[in-house]
Amino acid sequence: MLPDMSDPARNTEIGTVVRRHAPPKRQKNAKIRPREYLTEAEIDRLMKAARKRGRWGYRNATMILVAFRHGLRVGELVSLRWDQVDFATAHLHVNRLKRGRESQHPLSGPELRALRQLKREQTQGSRFVFLSERGSPLTPRGFAQMLSRSALSIDFPFPVHPHMLRHACGFKLANDGHDTRALQDYLGHRQIQHTVRYTEMAAARFNGFWAD
């Protein structure tokens, strides 16, 4: 049964989770980092580092995986509920913030396995997927700190922030040659110009220009 995201009470609760303990403002500065997205190889490294960080390592790695695969904003990630995860049909109901478009995303094998294990290990009986030590939803700031510490633990070459995972999703799918309109719907953009920035930088669109 898919959740009713038109319920004002539900949306109010989600908004409360997102606003509480917001992550620090990220700095967009070429002196701090060379780009605002991560590669798949870099995300794999971060997941491995996050998995090693104490008893919450499995949760941490799963959060990175889900955020990347579905292009989630940090607020969308920490607000994720179990009733948005349909294990029977292998789908995720993505409730977008910023008046974005809601959509149904397929869940891959690695995601399903990770989420099933996380649900088995979760003893608090919460409706939220990603919990803190106190059993409340992990905050955006908490996720940002975990991601930053994971990067520091492996001497990552530049500081990272959660939105880089969303950008990584956009650039990865654009470089795989997916249709811009489909990518717009997947990322929940209301305006296509926000999606075009990914396709404009996709090297794959120039494949075949030279036949050497």
Model-identified regions with their sequence ranges:
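Conserved catalytic core of the tyrosine transesterase superfamily
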Residues: M1-D212
